[in-house]
Amino acid sequence: MDVMNAFDSQAEDSPLSIGHSLRRRPLARKKLSEMVEEELEQMIRRHEFGEGEQLPSERELMAFFNVGRPSVREALAALKRKGLVQINNGERARVSRPSADTIISELSGMAKDFLSHPGGIAHFEQLRLFFESSLVRYAAEHATDEQIALLTKALEINSQSLDDNALFIRSDVEFHRVLAEIPGNPIFMAIHVALLDWLIAARPGVADRELHEHNNLSYQQHIAIVDAIRQRDPDKADRALQTHLNSVSATWHAFGKKNQKMR
C-alpha cells in the first residue's frame, strides 16, 4: 500500500448545493497524527504487527510516513489510550491487546463530566442498581461454596472496620468487588470498578462521626445479601440488594443536602 498517496490526496470540489438541504461547506482536514494513528491501527488489526511485537522506532516511523516526530508521538499516545500499544521509557512501542479496563478508562472522562450534570448521579446509581441486581441473582443461583466463603470473609473484614471510616469504605468496595467477580466476566469487573470509582468520587465530604451509623447499617445489609445467597434465593437476594443500594443512595443524598445548607 502507498501510504503517502492516501495522505497527499485532495478531495474534489463539491457542487455548491446538492438537492434542497445540503450546501457546500469546508471539510475538516485530518491532522497528520490522526492519519498516522489510523494507518498504524489498521496494520495492528491486520496483524502486520503481532501482540507483543515492537513497532518500528520513532525515526523509522517518521521516515515511513514522511511526518515529524510530534505527529508520530501523538499517534502512539492515541494508540496507547486505546490499549493497542504499551509505551515504556526508552523502549519502542509494543503491540498489546486491549483489555476491559482499557475500554472503561476511555469512558472515564465522559462519565465524570456526566456525573456533574443535574441528575447525573441518580442515573449512575440506577445503572449500579440494575447491574448489581443481576449480579446477586446470579450469585444466589450459581455461586460456588468457595465464592460464598470469599463473601463471608469480606463480611468479616467489614465487621472489623466499622470504627474506621477509611478502612470500612475499602472493605465495602471489596465486598461488592467479590460479588462482581462471581460470574467470572472481566467486563463485569471493569464496569463495577469504574462505577464505584465514579460514584465515590462524586460523594460529598462527611465528618467521620456521621458515618458510623451509616457503616453499621451497610454492614447489616451486607449480611442480609449474603444470607439470601447462601439460601440460594435469588428473589430474596435481589430485595436485600435493592434495600441496601437505595439506603446508600438516600444517605448520601441527605449528606449532600446537609452540606449545601451549611454553606
From Swiss-Prot:
UniProt-recorded Gene Ontology molecular function terms: DNA binding; DNA-binding transcription factor activity
Gene Ontology process terms (BP): negative regulation of DNA-templated transcription
SUPFAM superfamilies given in the database record: GntR ligand-binding domain-like, Winged helix' DNA-binding domain
Pfam families cross-referenced by the UniProt entry: FCD, GntR
Annotated HTH gntR-type domain residues: 30-98
Ranges annotated as DNA-binding: 58-77
Signal peptide annotation: none
Keywords: DNA-binding, Repressor, Transcription, Transcription regulation
Disulfide bonds: none
Stated family: Belongs to the NanR family.
PANTHER family xref list: HTH-TYPE TRANSCRIPTIONAL REPRESSOR NANR (PTHR43537:SF53), TRANSCRIPTIONAL REGULATOR, GNTR FAMILY (PTHR43537)
Purpose of the protein: Transcriptional repressor that controls expression of the genes required for the catabolism of sialic acids.
NCBIfam families linked: PRK03837.1
The protein, known as: HTH-type transcriptional repressor NanR
Species: Salmonella bongori (strain ATCC 43975 / DSM 13772 / NCTC 12419)
